[in-house]
């Protein structure tokens, strides 16, 4: 059995764009003319390891949606958490600021984001980066990981296909432990605020936050109603929160 599907563009890294097209298994170019054997779990619903997943924001669908084509996107993941779960408000990026993260194939994404801790950047990024960086325990496909891989030239290796398996077996890839630590600093609850070791701990902590719960319900209301809430909607919001707690 082939563990990995064939991809039409071998020169590309595996990103969200590759989810849009995977070469069909029955094409002659795939060399799969015999009976296919699948190793998907037969028990449904599948129970994910509790040390790897904790709710919707650790689901591969959300993680892939908030990824770049070829890498994670901790900044926009952090913005999502800050605005929708902590009811935070961010200003626009100043027009004279270069918002691009430096490119360096010899460094992990988190290492490349270190310049954002400079004083002129950190006054805003301190609100979002510590909330987005815990998701580094997953790759841009939402797969759980504990290490980053580097090739013999010291460049980060993003592919996860048959070639990856071969290089790993031959000992041609080195590893560097993932740093998924972060911090909750604006929940309004001292019991929730503080350092977190990864996204699972962060989600469990936010799950106990009154502010996160009420902010989530408020944004859910806006999504379904297509407008902001008004004073006259207070009863609806109170009932929505009661239903949330009861379930």
Language-model region placement:
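Active-site substrate-binding loop specific to GH73 endo-beta-N-acetylglucosaminidase modules
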Residues: 1-224, 234-246
């Amino acid at each position: 059995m082939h563990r990995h599907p064939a991809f039409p563009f071998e020169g590309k890294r595996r990103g969200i764009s590759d989810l849009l097209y995977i070469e069909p298994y029955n094409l002659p170019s795939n060399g799969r003319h015999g009976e296919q054997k699948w190793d998907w779990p037969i028990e449904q619903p599948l129970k994910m390891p509790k040390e790897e997943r904790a709710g919707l924001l650790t689901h591969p669908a959300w993680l892939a949606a908030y990824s770049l084509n070829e890498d994670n996107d901790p900044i926009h993941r952090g913005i999502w958490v800050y605005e929708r779960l902590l009811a935070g408000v961010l200003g626009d990026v100043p027009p004279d600021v270069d918002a691009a993260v430096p490119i360096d194939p010899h460094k992990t994404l988190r290492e490349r984001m270190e310049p954002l801790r400079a004083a002129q950047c950190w006054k805003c990024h301190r609100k979002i980066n510590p909330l987005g960086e815990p998701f580094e325990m997953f790759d841009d496909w939402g797969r759980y990981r504990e290490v980053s891989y580097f090739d013999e030239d010291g460049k980060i290796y993003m592919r996860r296909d048959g070639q990856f398996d071969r290089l790993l077996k031959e000992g041609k890839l080195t590893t560097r432990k993932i740093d998924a630590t972060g911090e909750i600093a604006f929940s309004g609850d001292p019991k929730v605020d503080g350092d977190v070791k990864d996204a699972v701990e962060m989600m469990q902590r936010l799950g106990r936050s009154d502010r996160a719960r009420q902010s989530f319900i408020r944004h859910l209301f806006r999504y379904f109603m297509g407008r902001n809430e008004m004073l006259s909607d207070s009863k609806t919001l109170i009932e929505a929160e009661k239903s949330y707690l009861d379930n």
